[in-house]
């Protein structure tokens, strides 16, 4: 039997489809026939009926039909299912044979053509030899047929043709060869499908009829066979629900069969076939849980049915194939839309398949381990006359034998031997690797990283057993990183051991050294004697010698590798290996630590390198060197020691570069930083520890940064969380876990020895030239050279502050937006020891709020460090926050001549502009002057003068001004610009040079309206009781029209009056009329005047309410005074 016997048959795994053969088509030489065939087969869409087509000649011989049994009473079956039965009904025995014939209804030679067609049909029937296969005829015609019933000739000839061919009307079809060929073909397919359905239905009934004659005593195998056939025919009929039902019945019947070593393989084979079908249909019906449940049941029922103990590897192979097949089904269902999860995906089944393949390998190594003198039996017990088995699952040397007793034990023994010898040639590792690879792909897809890593390790080990060491090393190397990062030290040690063997057998020197370094380290769980052996081998490699073989390696592979190692020794190639230890865990640990996070440039930079070895024996290194981001410092940080090659493994702890296991060794370095590195970070980019010498092989252990390896971060975290008290060590020793890596330090400038003081009077006032006095005093012992001052707004603040802040050195300057916010590098000169100087800075702040100002003083000075003179740049900076406030608030309002608030003014009517300046400054303010600048649309009634000139305002005090203005008529209806109000002010200070600040306040716009009539009243400021009070009213026409005015006077209780009580006037455009009244006050006090009422006939909207804005309504009346006579004076 061949190894492929465990593969499921192709006819079992494919989707069963109705088989239809097409005859009468010449697809090679006839273009019409070729077009018909392509329409049937090419580019079939998923929605077309499931039919398998095949073109055969008309006289093709189909498989012969055996004579049917009339009784099963004495019939004893020889097996369950014949190996060719499924293929026969899928590809050999058609459900329908279609005869294609070119014949039109108007064919002149109709009789001859009809007879020829009938002959072809009869030949097909003869070749089917009594099978139930349906026969149909398709007439290929050139013309499109008329609708049914309209072509009488066609109907008559169709009936005649059916009669001649012995066909029903449903079995005769017409295929016009037109542009719509595909559409006709699809309709033909549907008709063919119905005929095929009928055929398979008939076959199912035929098989069921046989079951009536069976008994369970001698026909147990037939029960299974018939039930399988019914299910298979149901699948061909596309009745998958009934197919699943019958497959389940067949599966139960299989397990009811009596099992013995002789028929165990046949039972398992058929159980596997039927289980595959059940699971496939469950996935097809979208019931994956039923498929999984069926498969678990199948495995539980079959895993104990091992069969012959001498062929136990066959059971493992069969179990492996069951899991692999189910995994394939599961994966196929996922590709068709099924959703899987992490805990239930095909990977688990591929993994189990791989485990059984590994078990098969182990059993084969035990059972097939025959002596080389054992030869393969002759004749071959596995050969058959036909080259294939008659029944699935039977032994070739006893086919059809149902007896449990072996009639020929010697033949059985030879058969088992041949199977064992063939199994010995199977490449088990390839099978295992393929299955593991499938499982890895699934676990990667469903994001199961640990399962993926676990299986990759097994793949690597399997490659190792298959002697493909390069692939093994590649896989193991990939997985090591994950186990290192998670701290699985035992697993890591096992993987490293296998990797070391691979690198040894391939004579890969660098890999061998790398894995040896890690197996000697603290992460390795090897025993000390194993570590000692590895350490000695490592030293041999470094001395350019061949290492001793690794234990448990294949003898032939070891012999080949020793030759490779000898070749490596003799080659005069590069013997320097640089190993980046950041990604693994070597036996030497390294930590670099600067003594401080920053150093002044005039102080030597100092740092320590701590080394610790974890190998079994003391080991001597040849060189230690440190690299920095500035390579100029590398030359100062090197330790080197020469020794003989034989002294690498040093038993004593003497020597500068000798590391004793478990002891921490410290190396101290110092150097003077360069002045150009001030403000920069000095970083240790790498630490190189060199093992070996140039005369042998040299290994450079390279730590990136300040040391640490793949386990350092995890160990540091554990140490930080640990509450365990550390034992006390001698003064010159430290706890390794307590050391923290400090791989960088800052070089900062020398500490300045000058003082900077700032003097000012906060807060600052908006737009004033605020004075900030900077006082610099030197306390240096030598001259401070090239002193420079930078002053202004500190960078990094709001951009709006930068735009609204200006700095200058001269207070008399008028700052605008062109002045900077920061004055850099103002030269001051040299400062002698103890010398002091002052520098005033003037700042203009255009907006309120807090600002941070920077004063930065830098200078150069000579100093000596470690006997080396350097020029240091020192600096001192001071910051101060200055609050800016408004100096005053200005209130602007418009009022009438009666001092009433105006929300709008009237053209050519005088009104008042009132300003009120309220001091908000904590310091006294001097208002130097004020100025009103009117716009072109506004005029002044009188001379504009400042009434607040040289007024000093304390906090909270205010100063007011009043201006009488007039606005000419305007054309637009919007607001009119008034102008601006300019206040010139400064802080009140005895210093005359305090600059004056001009603050411009834009006056609000006013709405100007025109009125048709303006009324002005001339009357005294007060009246007296019973004294005449003359009042004159001026009525001025403000329009271009003649105004008809009705004037009336409404009396008051406090006055009598003389004049016209009611009058009608006509006022010409631009002119005025006067109306004169004499009022006679009757009582003292603030009395209401008689009311003047005006009615404009052309402007009915002109109201008296508007009139009252222009004329007074009340007047103060004094009491009547006594006349001074002599008597009264005397009495007084």
From Swiss-Prot:
Localization annotation: Golgi apparatus; Golgi apparatus, cis-Golgi network
Cellular component terms per the entry's GO annotation: Golgi apparatus
UniProt main location, coarse: Golgi
A Pfam family the protein falls into: Foie-gras_1
Keywords in alphabetical order: ER-Golgi transport, Golgi apparatus, Transport
Keyword ATP-binding among record annotations: no
Biological processes per GO annotation: vesicle-mediated transport
Task performed by this protein: Involved in endoplasmic reticulum to Golgi apparatus trafficking at a very early stage.
Family: Belongs to the TRAPPC11 family.
Name this polypeptide is given: Trafficking protein particle complex subunit 11
Gene: TRAPPC11
């Amino acid at each position: 039997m061949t190894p492929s016997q465990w593969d499921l048959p192709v006819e079992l795994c494919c989707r069963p489809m109705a088989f239809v053969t097409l005859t009468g088509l010449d697809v090679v030489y006839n273009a019409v026939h070729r077009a018909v065939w392509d329409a049937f087969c090419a580019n079939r869409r998923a929605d077309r009926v499931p039919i398998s087509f095949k073109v055969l000649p008309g006289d093709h011989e189909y498989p012969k039909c055996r004579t049917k049994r009339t009784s099963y009473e004495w019939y004893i079956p020889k097996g369950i299912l014949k190996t060719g039965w499924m293929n026969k009904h899928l590809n050999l025995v058609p459900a329908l044979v279609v005869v294609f014939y070119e014949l039109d209804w108007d064919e002149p030679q109709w009789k001859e053509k009809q007879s020829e067609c009938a002959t072809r049909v009869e030949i097909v029937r003869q070749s089917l030899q009594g099978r139930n296969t349906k026969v149909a005829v398709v007439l290929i015609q050139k013309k499109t047929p008329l609708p049914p019933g309209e072509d009488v000739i066609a109907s008559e000839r169709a009936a005649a043709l059916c009669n001649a061919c012995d066909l029903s009307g449903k079995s005769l079809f017409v295929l016009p060869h037109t542009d719509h060929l595909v559409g006709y073909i699809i309709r033909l397919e549907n008709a063919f499908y119905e005929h095929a359905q009928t055929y398979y239905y008939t076959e199912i009934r035929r098989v069921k009829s046989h079951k009536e004659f069976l008994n369970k005593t001698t026909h147990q195998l037939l029960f299974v066979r018939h039930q399988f056939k019914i299910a298979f025919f149901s699948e061909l009929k596309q009745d998958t629900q009934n197919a699943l039902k019958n497959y389940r019945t067949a599966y139960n019947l299989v397990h009811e069969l009596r099992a013995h070593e002789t028929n165990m393989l046949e039972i398992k084979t058929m159980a596997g076939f039927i289980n595959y079908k059940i699971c496939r249909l469950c996935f097809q019906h979208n019931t994956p849980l039923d498929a999984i449940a069926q498969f678990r049941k199948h495995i539980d029922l079959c895993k104990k049915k091992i069969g012959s103990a001498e062929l136990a590897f066959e059971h493992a192979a069969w179990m492996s194939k069951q899991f692999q097949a189910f995994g394939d089904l599961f994966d196929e269902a996922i590709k068709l839309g099924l959703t899987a999860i992490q805990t239930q995906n095909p990977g688990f089944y591929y993994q189990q398949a791989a485990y059984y393949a590994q078990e098969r390998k182990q059993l084969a190594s035990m059972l097939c381990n025959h002596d080389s003198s054992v030869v393969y039996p002759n004749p071959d017990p596995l050969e058959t006359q036909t080259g294939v088995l008659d029944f699935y699952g039977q032994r070739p040397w006893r086919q059809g034998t149902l007896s449990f007793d072996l009639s020929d034990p010697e033949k059985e023994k030879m058969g088992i031997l041949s199977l064992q010898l063939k199994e010995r040639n199977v490449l088990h590792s390839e099978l295992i690797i393929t299955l593991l690879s499938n499982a890895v792909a699934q676990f990667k897809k469903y994001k199961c990283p640990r399962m993926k890593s676990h299986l990759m390790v097994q793949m690597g080990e399997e490659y190792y057993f298959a002697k493909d060491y390069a692939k093994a090393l590649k896989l193991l190397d990939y997985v090591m990183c994950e186990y290192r990062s998670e701290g699985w030290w035992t697993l890591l040690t096992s993987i490293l051991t296998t990797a070391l063997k691979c690198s040894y057998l391939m004579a890969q020197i660098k890999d061998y050294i790398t894995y040896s370094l890690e197996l000697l380290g603290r992460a390795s769980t090897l025993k000390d004697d194993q570590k000692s052996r590895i350490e000695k081998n490592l030293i041999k490699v470094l001395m350019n010698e061949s290492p001793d073989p690794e234990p448990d390696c294949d003898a032939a592979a070891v012999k080949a590798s020793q030759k490779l190692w000898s070749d490596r020794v003799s080659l005069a190639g590069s013997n320097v290996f640089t190993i980046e230890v950041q990604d693994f865990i070597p036996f030497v640990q390294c930590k670099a630590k600067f003594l401080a996070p920053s150093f002044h440039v005039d102080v030597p930079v100092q740092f320590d390198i701590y080394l610790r070895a974890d190998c079994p024996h003391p080991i001597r290194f040849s060189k230690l060197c440190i690299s920095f981001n500035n390579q100029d410092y590398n030359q100062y940080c090197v330790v080197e020691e020469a020794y003989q090659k034989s002294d690498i493994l040093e038993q004593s702890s003497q020597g500068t570069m000798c590391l004793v296991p478990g002891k921490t060794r410290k190396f101290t370095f110092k150097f003077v930083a360069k002045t150009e590195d001030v403000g920069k970070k000095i970083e240790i980019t790498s630490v190189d520890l060199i093992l070996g010498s140039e005369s042998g092989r040299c290994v450079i252990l390279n730590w990136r940064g300040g040391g640490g390896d793949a386990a350092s971060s995890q160990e540091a975290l554990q140490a930080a969380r640990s509450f365990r008290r550390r034992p006390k060590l001698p003064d010159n020793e430290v706890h390794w876990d307590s050391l923290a890596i400090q791989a960088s330090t800052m070089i900062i400038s020398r500490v300045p020895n000058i003082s900077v003081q700032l003097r000012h009077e906060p807060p600052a006032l908006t737009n004033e030239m605020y004075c900030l006095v900077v006082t610099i005093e030197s306390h240096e012992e030598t001259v401070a050279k090239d002193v420079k001052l930078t002053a202004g707004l500190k960078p990094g603040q709001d951009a709006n502050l930068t735009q609204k802040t200006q700095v200058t050195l001269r207070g008399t300057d008028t700052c605008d937006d062109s002045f900077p916010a920061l004055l850099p590098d103002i030269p001051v000169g040299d400062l002698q020891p103890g010398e002091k100087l002052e520098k005033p800075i003037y700042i203009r702040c255009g907006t309120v709020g807090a600002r941070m100002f920077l004063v930065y003083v830098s200078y150069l000075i000579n100093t000596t460090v470690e006997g080396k003179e350097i020029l240091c740049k020192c600096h001192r900076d001071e910051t101060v926050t200055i609050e800016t406030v408004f100096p005053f608030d200005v209130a602007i309002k418009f009022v009438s001549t009666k001092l009433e608030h105006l929300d709008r003014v009237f053209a050519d009517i005088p009104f008042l502009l009132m300003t009120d300046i309220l001091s908000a400054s904590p310091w006294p303010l001097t208002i130097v002057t004020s100025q009103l600048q009117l716009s072109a649309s506004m005029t002044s009634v009188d001379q504009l003068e400042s009434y607040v000139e040289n007024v000093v305002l304390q906090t909270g005090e205010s100063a007011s001004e009043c201006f009488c203005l007039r606005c000419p008529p305007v054309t637009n209806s919007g607001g009119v610009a008034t102008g601006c109000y300019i206040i010139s002010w400064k802080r009140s200070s005895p210093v005359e040079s305090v600059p004056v600040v001009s603050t411009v306040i834009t006056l609000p716009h006013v709405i100007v309206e025109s009125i048709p009539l303006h009324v002005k009243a001339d009357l005294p400021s007060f009246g007296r009781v019973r004294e005449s009070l003359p009042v004159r009213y001026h009525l001025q026409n403000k329009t271009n029209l003649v105004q008809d005015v009705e004037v009336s006077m409404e009396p008051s209780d406090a006055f009598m009056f003389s004049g016209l009580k009611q009058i009608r006037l006509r006022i010409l455009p631009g002119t005025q009329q006067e109306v004169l009244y004499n009022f006679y006050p009757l009582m003292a006090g603030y009395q209401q005047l008689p009311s003047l009422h005006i009615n404009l006939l052309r402007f009915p909207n002109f109201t008296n309410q508007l009139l009252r804005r222009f004329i007074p309504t009340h007047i103060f009346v004094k009491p009547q005074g006594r006349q001074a006579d002599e008597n009264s004076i005397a009495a007084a």
